[in-house]
Amino acid sequence: MRKFAAFACGTGAGFAAYYFQKLRDPLQVVHNSWTNSERHISECALWDSNWDYRDPKSLARPMKNDKPQEQNRYNADLEKNVSKYARHIILIRHGEYLDVGETDETHHLTDRGRLQAKYTGKRLHELGIKWDKVIASNMVRAQETAEIILNEIDFDKTKVKSCSYLREGAPIPPQPPVGHWKPEASQFFRDGARIEAAFRRYFHRALPDQEKDSYTLIVGHGNVIRYFVCRALQFPAEGWLRININHASITWLTISPSGNVSIKYLGDTGFIPAKHLTNRIPREAKNVV
């Protein structure tokens, strides 16, 4: 009996100490996961289904009254504006290049950058995609990358489009700020509007008359691609600089008919040999490979 009494007293004391500590300091209560039923959903986590302003409800003419004829007209408007297929947008960062000279015309791909682009072209060929559109930034390094890729994939070179909106730039002041890269406020003002315009031009759900899934290839730049990813996934756009992607990498985003967006690849370069992987401008102007 004495052993049992001692055990009972010890157990009781343990429970008492536990509950005393819990009541004394509720902050030390440990939940079984980071999320729990008492945690409120952050405002920035809520999905905006009309982010591209192409939700059928925003395109249909509102009902004027509750009469059956008006309801039928409204429902017909909704149906007429419904997307039926997905849009796949594949973003390629240009290959490694040399930042020499004062103008873009002197910023050519290095030998390694050209090799990277060739590996990317072969990878895209292996994926067997039938491309609907190919668009490239009009900067030299993106044009050269696109030209090399086009030698590997099945697409009519005469149909390639160049776009000045896709030029490299400073999309939005990053958070957290970094000390090694501080553009002037005027550059963010100028580049940010242009890059946002590029996003709105190329990122939207399929038009209602699209008859199959479409595949668009865009050859561009690191800052622009990272900004596009944040905007498309509705992550805070200020976080774009937290993402790092290699030269000639593949980023694949899919926009479903409902307007939902998913990412299949982010900066994929697994098809490029490790010795040829880069993400920064090389220090040396010669003997890059």
Curated annotation (Swiss-Prot):
Coiled coil residues, start to end: none
- Localization of this protein: Mitochondrion outer membrane
Q: Which SUPFAM superfamilies match?
A: Phosphoglycerate mutase-like
- Which terms under GO biological process does the entry name? positive regulation of mitochondrial fission; protein dephosphorylation
Membrane is among the record's keywords: yes
Is Hydrolase tagged as a keyword? yes
Q: Where is the signal peptide?
A: none
EC top class named in words: hydrolase
Q: Which reaction does it catalyse?
A: O-phospho-L-seryl-[protein] + H2O = L-seryl-[protein] + phosphate; O-phospho-L-threonyl-[protein] + H2O = L-threonyl-[protein] + phosphate
Predominant location of this chain? mitochondrion
| EC number(s) reported in the record | 3.1.3.16
> What are the alphabetically sorted keywords of the record?
Hydrolase, Membrane, Mitochondrion, Mitochondrion outer membrane
Cysteine disulfide links? none
> What is a single cellular component term in the Gene Ontology annotation?
mitochondrial outer membrane
A Gene Ontology MF term for this entry? protein serine/threonine phosphatase activity
Q: Which family does it belong to?
A: Belongs to the phosphoglycerate mutase family. BPG-dependent PGAM subfamily.
* Function, in words: Displays phosphatase activity for serine/threonine residues, and dephosphorylates and activates Pk92B kinase. Has apparently no phosphoglycerate mutase activity.
Q: How does it assemble?
A: Interacts with Pk92B/ASK1.
Give the protein's recorded name. Answer: Serine/threonine-protein phosphatase Pgam5, mitochondrial
